[in-house]
């Protein structure tokens, strides 16, 4: 029983040690991930938005809406902003963004473009919530086991 208590103590002491290291992040193709492009999409007629310029009209009639942007070179680690503005309700699942340079704004630039803004809601309709759940600390179970082992040893000695 004493050997078990010593083993539990050694395991719990080892479980408390950890090592922080920094390493490269690799993409699905095995190349190092150099940077991330964050794009917030806003469409404004013939207006420059960061490095992107709307080259066509941005009317949103009853049909499909399409925008063409020029000067759209994406740089890793950079944020770009677009503004989608409209006076009527727009169904977000109808919007798709692809770059003429075949860059996927949601992944690495080497991947095929397949970006869509699906099931979007306006700020007045969307609500965020932060929920947490109680999770016991990993060593608390081991400490409980060590305490029960100590009580068992004490009871055995009496």
Which residue ranges define each predicted feature?
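Conserved Rossmann-like nucleotide-cofactor binding loop
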Residues: 149
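C-terminal membrane-anchoring or membrane-association module
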Residues: 152-158
């Amino acid at each position: 029983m004493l050997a078990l208590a010593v083993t539990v103590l050694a395991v719990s002491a080892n479980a408390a040690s950890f090592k922080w290291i920094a390493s490269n992040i690799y993409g699905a193709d095995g190349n190092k991930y150099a940077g991330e492009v964050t794009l917030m999409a806003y469409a404004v007629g013939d207006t420059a938005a960061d490095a992107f310029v709307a080259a066509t009209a941005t009317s949103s009639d009853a049909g499909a809406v399409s925008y063409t942007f020029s000067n759209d070179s994406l740089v890793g680690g950079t944020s770009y902003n677009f503004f989608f503005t409209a006076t009527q309700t727009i169904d977000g699942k109808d919007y798709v963004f692809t770059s003429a340079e075949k860059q996927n704004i949601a992944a690495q630039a080497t991947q095929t473009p397949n970006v869509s803004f699906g099931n979007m809601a306006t700020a007045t309709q969307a609500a965020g919530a932060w929920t947490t759940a109680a999770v016991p600390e990993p060593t608390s179970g081991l400490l409980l086991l060590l305490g029960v082992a100590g009580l068992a040893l004490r009871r055995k000695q009496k």
